[in-house]
Curated annotation (Swiss-Prot):
It catalyses: (6R)-5,10-methylene-5,6,7,8-tetrahydrofolate + NADP(+) = (6R)-5,10-methenyltetrahydrofolate + NADPH; (6R)-5,10-methenyltetrahydrofolate + H2O = (6R)-10-formyltetrahydrofolate + H(+). SUPFAM superfamilies: Aminoacid dehydrogenase-like, N-terminal domain (SSF53223), NAD(P)-binding Rossmann-fold domains (SSF51735). Its EC number is 1.5.1.5, 3.5.4.9. Keywords: Amino-acid biosynthesis, Histidine biosynthesis, Hydrolase, Methionine biosynthesis, Multifunctional enzyme, NADP, One-carbon metabolism, Oxidoreductase, Purine biosynthesis. This is Bifunctional protein FolD. GO terms for biological process: L-histidine biosynthetic process; methionine biosynthetic process; purine nucleotide biosynthetic process; tetrahydrofolate interconversion. The gene is folD. InterPro entries: Aminoacid_DH-like_N_sf, NAD(P)-bd_dom_sf, THF_DH/CycHdrlase, THF_DH/CycHdrlase_cat_dom, THF_DH/CycHdrlase_CS, THF_DH/CycHdrlase_NAD-bd_dom. Pathway: One-carbon metabolism; tetrahydrofolate interconversion. Coiled coil: none annotated. The lineage of its organism: Bacteria, Pseudomonadati, Campylobacterota, Epsilonproteobacteria, Campylobacterales. Pfam families: THF_DHG_CYH, THF_DHG_CYH_C.
Length: 288
């Protein structure tokens, strides 16, 4: 069994981002990410602060917009349109969840696809499914980077994705399919889940239930990717996989914390730099 170290891999990605940001600045382009936070949700504030800190450490300018809980949908859309038109902004991120009176889909669809560094816009989703070049959601993109870092080729593998969210499950399945894995997506209505998982060479657990994947669901030598971050009543953080029981059976496994989690912000930075490079290319400043 080998641990897939997300901390080490994310540090490598951030170093690459910093180097690319420096090159862009030398060419007269300052990469910039606009982050919009509506309301005062504590978890969202923590995530936003982590993203800001990561931007600053990597040479990306972070532009923060904190809006009150009472902000109307039209006010939020108006701000997004201003940022769309601002040529100095490369990426726009709206921290989710949004207050109940705001339609999330309308908000995400208002962000221009070329600035949609979260990869949630329908155009980017369509490009991913079609195997075209676009922005990909950060968590599944980070998982693919970890697999690549450890020399794991998914082509021909039987892969099972547990969970069908738009943020992780569906894009993860598309990425694996594009990489020539044979993919099964399972969810709350799936029958014979244990049987399906037991035949998998690769399992990606993204269901949001602590210790959901048990040893009897995993075959010997399987690769196990744990996307879950669940806090137990005793304060411990655990994933969707029963790590202690599953790890001895697996060939590779991601821990929680320190596995997939660190990769999400790293790939957000990577997507932002990619957008900035596109801006520089469009301006004729760089050729690649």
């Amino acid at each position: 069994m080998k641990i897939l170290d997300g901390k080490a891999t994310s540090a490598k990605v951030k170093a690459e981002v910093k180097e690319r940001a420096s090159a862009l600045k030398n060419a007269g382009i300052e990469p910039a990410l606009a982050v919009i936070l509506v309301g005062s949700d504590k978890a969202s504030q923590t995530y936003v602060a982590a993203k800001q800190k990561a931007c600053e450490a990597s040479g990306i300018r972070s532009v923060m917009h904190k809006l009150p809980q009472t902000t109307s949908q039209n006010e939020l859309l108006a701000l997004i349109n201003v940022l769309n038109l601002d040529d100095s902004i490369d990426g726009i991120l709206v921290q989710l969840p949004l207050p109940a009176h705001i339609d999330t889909t309308s908000v995400l669809e208002t962000i221009w696809p070329q600035k949609d560094v979260d990869g949630f816009h329908a155009e980017n989703v369509g490009k991913l499914v079609s195997g075209l070049d676009g922005f990909v959601p950060c968590t599944p993109l980070g998982i693919m980077r970890i697999l690549k870092e450890y020399g794991i080729d998914v082509a021909g593998l039987n892969a099972v994705v547990i969970g069908r969210s738009n943020i992780v499950g569906k894009p993860m399945a598309s990425l694996l399919l594009n990489a020539s894995a044979t993919v099964t997506i399972t969810h709350s209505k799936t029958r014979n889940l244990k049987q399906i998982c037991s035949a998998a060479d690769l399992i990606v657990a993204a269901i949001g239930k602590p210790n959901f994947v048990t040893a009897d669901m995993v075959k010997e030598g399987a690769i196990v990717i744990d996307v879950g971050i669940n806090r137990l009543d005793d304060g411990r953080l655990v994933g969707d996989v029963d790590f202690e029981a599953v790890a001895p059976k697996s060939s590779f496994i991601t821990p929680v914390p320190g596995g997939v989690g660190p990769m999400t912000i790293a790939m957000l930075l990577s997507n932002t730099i990619r957008s900035a490079q596109n801006r520089a290319k469009n301006l004729g400043i760089v050729k690649e």
